[in-house]
């Protein structure tokens, strides 16, 4: 997959989505992925910051961008029911970006992952 992206005639990226571990992010980076997502949304804020910062520092050292998640999106993909979803506080998001230097954020704003009935 990485080789196909590198040989494409148009710009292409290879992205690791929703990794919950530093080790898996590092494996993807070693394989040549252009971007990774570290999903520490299941962790307390401070632990999510520490994990994300560790991934960002390693990834940025080799030119790889990083997405992180803050809050809990409802839906099939994350295994969260609507009742357990947690909307991201904008002040927490700003602080998180400042502390981690992450490139992109997945935030919970009342949206959901996965399938919608009737769509």
Give, region by region, the residue ranges found by the protein language model:
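Alpha/beta enzyme core
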Residues: 1-11, 18-119
């Amino acid at each position: 997959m990485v080789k196909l992206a590198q040989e494409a005639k148009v710009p292409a990226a290879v992205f690791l989505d929703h990794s919950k571990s530093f080790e898996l992010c590092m494996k993807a980076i070693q394989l040549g992925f252009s971007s990774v997502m570290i999903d520490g949304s299941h962790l307390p804020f401070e632990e999510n910051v520490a994990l994300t910062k560790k991934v960002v520092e390693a990834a940025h050292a080799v030119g790889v961008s990083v997405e992180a998640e803050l809050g809990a999106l409802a839906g099939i993909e994350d295994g969260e029911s609507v009742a357990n979803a947690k909307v991201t506080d904008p002040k927490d998001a700003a602080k998180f970006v400042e502390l981690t230097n992450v490139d992109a954020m997945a935030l919970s704003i009342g949206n959901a992952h996965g399938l919608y009935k009737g769509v």
